Each structure stands twice: as structure tokens, then as C-alpha cells.
Amino acid sequence: MNAVIVDAKRTIFGNQNGLLKPFLPEDLAAPIIRCLSRKLEDQVDEVILGNATGRGGNLARLSALQAGLPLSVPGMTIDRQCGSGLEAVRYACSLIQAGAGTMYIAGGSESSSQSPFSERARFSPDAIGDPDMGIAAEYTAARYSISRSMQDEYALLSHQRSRNAHDEGFYREEVVALGELETDEAFLKTRPIEAIIPRAKPVFDTSSGTVTAANSSGIADGAAALLVMEEEKAAALGLKPVLRFIGSAVSGIHPNFPPAAPVVAIRQLLHTHDVTPDDIDLFEINEAFAVKICVCSQELGIPFSKINVRGGALALGHPYGASGAALVTRLFYEAKRRPDCQYAVAAIGSGGGIGLALLFEVLA
């Protein structure tokens, strides 16, 4: 059985303690669930959501109920830290492939502003190494010889792409408004990013570091989710799918180098399905740090022209548990604009040194 993506939505993304501070994770997720399930409420098999910094409980079930889905629709919440939202999509697709169901809403929701935790979780035993993510980015830059100028070059490109995507209305079609909130917080002010990036000072290794606030993503609040169906079910409902799930790969690397984790996952994914980076038209790789994209480009031989073509987290921010679902949401809309594309990949790395990658065939 084939799993396909037939719809995708996200909220705006807001800075931590910014526009979306009053919203709990379920407040962010419920409007998306409501939008994706319209006229299909009683056919949804389950809601699966990723979340990394929440209050516990079962966010997916809570959000499904808040969205008004029937009491019979269960929910499951996944924590793979930054990979949570992408894992939710992977899990839904795998359930369909296994014949366990025919329709899922899968994604993630995060409110760092409402998190009850003042300290981050541990990702690895101290004996192995459990660096903060910024320090891990510095370790990765040093190990793979990624210079400050390489990181800044990509950061500027990503900011420009995001601004252009906003100005051209591409982000607007992704977004479900939260009341009157329908514009990402990043675009409410104009910043001279071309001047800010080269002037920014290292923040994690102040003596000789290369990772700055300007070539790193900001912590954000937001949600994203997709309507995942069995392909024949979508056809029976008269819905046109855009992406067909082909397969996935998950891998672990040394926890000191999590920004490099997508490299191993993507390499494994492509090898399993006998394709090369040249065969892939679009890559969405989470921009927690510019060094992550630079490493993926360098180690896999992927030109920047194929990666995050409408920008990403460097401008919009990184709502941990939602970011992976936002990657697939962006692929969904970009694939609709590029009917000549054949394959697309979404990938993310997370704390503890875990990489996750999904391969899709473009059907648009």
C-alpha cells in the first residue's frame, strides 16, 4: 500500500516569548487539525504529533479533541526532539504501508515559550559527551573544516530566499491563520541582514568560534501537520496527492556532532533506494545551524541550489517538535509549483546525534 500526502498546513512561526507566547501547543495544533480534517473528521484513523519541550501527557489526543474530532479518533505523541515532527510523518506513512490504517494527520507542535522546563534535557551520558547544541555546531564546523565565511554565505542565501518567499506569497499558502496572526514574526520588521551577518560575533566559542547568532536559527513557537492517506483512499475521495512516500532512514552518530547526522541518514536512504543526490530535485534539511547545511552540501555533493530553495529556520526560527513537519509542508507546496520534479528528500538532525531522512516521489 502506498502512503501519499494530500494536504499540508502550518501556523505562523513566532519567536520564543514573542507573538505566539500566549498559545499552548494544543492551541497551535488544533486549528491545523481542524483545517486538514474538514469534511473527513470521522475518517481520520489517528492524530500523530511530535513535541519536544511540552508539559507531558498526550498532546496529540488533546489537540485532536480541541479541534473537534470525534471522540473515537485516538492520538499519539512522539518525542525524537528536533526530529519529532518528521518522525510523526514517517510513522503515519509506515502505518499505511503496513495496512494499519488509511488516513492520518501527522506533524508536530511546539511552544518553547510555554515550556515548563528551564534546562534542556540530557541527550547523551557525560562519559560520551553531551554538548549544548551550539558547542556541538562548533565541534562539527571544526571536524568538517567548515569556515565562518561558508556558514555566513549560506545564512545570507537562506535569509534572502525566505524574504523572497514571503514577498512573493509562497508562505501565505502554507499558513493557517491564528485569529489575525497570519504573518511569520520574522517578517514584521525589516532587518539589514546583509550587514548583521558579517558583524555577528561567535556566541558559543568566543575566542575562535565560527558559529554566531546570525548563522544559527532562533528558538521558535509553531505547529505544522500533513494529511497522509493511503493512495487508493485518496483517489476514492477525489483528492489529488502531491507526494508519495518511498522510504526512510534513521541513523545515529557521535552525540558531539549532531549537525552532521543528516549526512549519514541521507546517504543510507539514497543507497537503500538506489538513487543518488543527482536524482533528487529538492532537499529540505532543517537549518538549526548554517553549518549543518554546509556539511550536508559538502559531504553529499549537493549544491545549495537544491537545498531549502524557499529558505528555512535561519530566518523563520526552529520550533523543535514541529520543524520536521514544516520541512515536508514546504516540499509539498514547492512540488506543486515544480511538476517537472521527480524526487524530494526531507531530513533533520537532533540532539544525541540522530539523523532522519524521508524520500518522496513527486506526483504533482
From Swiss-Prot:
Record gene name: yhfS
Keywords on record: Acyltransferase, Transferase
Any single Pfam family the record assigns to this protein: Thiolase_N
PROSITE patterns for the chain: THIOLASE_2
Family from the record: Belongs to the thiolase-like superfamily. Thiolase family.
Induction pattern: Repressed by presence of biotin, under control of BirA. Probably part of the bioY-yhfST operon.
Transmembrane domains' residue ranges: none
Protein name listed in UniProt: Putative acetyl-CoA C-acetyltransferase YhfS
Enzyme Commission number(s) from the entry: 2.3.1.-
The keyword Transferase is annotated on this UniProt entry: yes
Keyword Transferase applies: yes
